[in-house]
Amino acid sequence: MARKQVSRKRRVKKNIENGVAHIRSTFNNTIVTITDEFGNALSWSSAGALGFKGSKKSTPFAAQMASETASKTAMEHGLKSVEVTVKGPGPGRESAIRALQSAGLEVTAIRDVTPVPHNGCRPPKRRRV
């Protein structure tokens, strides 16, 4: 029996010059998503997606690599300048921003959008190791 041919969607090159780089830096991982001004994702990468496992995901080097790969694929769409929003307290915050600059993107603004509770939910109990 002959198999049906599945038509695959080709990745279309978008000509977007300014975008927003969302860096989510937790204690366990760093996720970098680069979007256009409206929030539509152009490219994304994370330390876990690059093959870092366990505690190696939370290193600044892993955040740097994730930021570099996300910026390279976004620059293929014509991205030149980027605003950076950083969320979370993780160790990969600064190194991810530096990697965006060294990849050739012009960083126009850096915003910290870490959510801070106004005494909301009770935090989890302290770890005793």
Curated annotation (Swiss-Prot):
Coiled-coil annotated spans: none
GO term, biological process aspect, one: translation
Pfam families to which the protein is assigned, alphabetical: Ribosomal_S11 (PF00411)
Record keyword rRNA-binding present: yes
Recorded superkingdom: Bacteria
Cellular component terms (Gene Ontology): ribonucleoprotein complex; ribosome
Example GO molecular function: structural constituent of ribosome
Record keywords: Ribonucleoprotein, Ribosomal protein, RNA-binding, rRNA-binding
SUBUNIT field: Part of the 30S ribosomal subunit. Interacts with proteins S7 and S18. Binds to IF-3.
Family according to the record: Belongs to the universal ribosomal protein uS11 family.
Its biological purpose: Located on the platform of the 30S subunit, it bridges several disparate RNA helices of the 16S rRNA. Forms part of the Shine-Dalgarno cleft in the 70S ribosome.
HAMAP family: Ribosomal_uS11
Protein name: Small ribosomal subunit protein uS11
Species of the source: Staphylococcus saprophyticus subsp. saprophyticus (strain ATCC 15305 / DSM 20229 / NCIMB 8711 / NCTC 7292 / S-41)
